[in-house]
A protein has these predicted regions:
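Small/polar-rich, solvent-exposed N-terminal microdomains that initiate assembly or binding
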Residues: 1-49, 87-91, 134-135
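Generic structural motif
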Residues: 24, 38-40, 67-69, 126-130
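Intrinsically disordered, low-complexity acidic/polar segments
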Residues: 44, 71-73, 130-134
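Short, solvent-exposed beta-strand/turn "edge" segments of beta-rich domains on protein surfaces
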Residues: 49-54, 112-114
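A short glycine/small-residue-enriched secondary-structure motif
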Residues: 52-58, 97-100
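Oligomerization/assembly interface segments of phage tail-like spikes and tubes
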Residues: 54-68, 117-128
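Mid-chain, well-packed structural core segment of small domains
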Residues: 65-89
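Acidic-leaning, charged glycine-interspersed low-complexity segments
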Residues: 85-129
Length: 135
């Protein structure tokens, strides 16, 4: 699973005006950034080797960059958190997200230099691994 698959899934929720990957100078309000998690996570492999794995884990950071209202930002953050947390067997391009496990609760990180409130969700996206032909 690629970060772009997660970005497309988050965009399909229809909760933000824009969903992006990577740096976005002069971010408009009501956007969600999707990043690879910078936290360290232990490597796991199935007993018997990677060929026997039925699922994989993609750790992602979601940055909610909303507006100058803390109340509206928190409401949008909770909506995103719940939508992600409740996802089950969700298609994302050519992948299937089996479920999403938040690493911790919704985090308020204050405002950016423009006074726009931001919140962060760290989550593990558990996705199905199949016998797909490798390109």
């Amino acid at each position: 699973m690629m970060l772009s698959d997660i970005r497309d899934y988050i965009a399909s929720l229809g909760l933000a005006d824009s969903v992006y990957i990577g740096p976005l100078p002069d971010k408009p309000e009501k956007t969600i950034g999707v990043y690879n998690s910078k936290h360290q996570h232990e490597y796991k492999v199935a007993v018997g080797g990677p060929q026997l794995e039925s699922y994989g884990t993609k750790y992602v950071t979601l940055l909610l960059h909303w507006n100058k209202s803390q109340r509206e930002t928190e409401k949008a953050g909770k909506s995103l958190f719940e939508a992600v947390r409740r996802s089950r067997n969700t298609p994302a391009n050519n992948e299937t997200i089996k479920f999403t496990l938040p690493v911790y609760d919704l985090q308020d990180i204050g405002t950016d230099d423009s006074g726009v409130y931001e919140m962060v969700i760290e989550a593990a996206f558990i996705y199905e691994k199949g016998n797909k032909d490798e390109e």
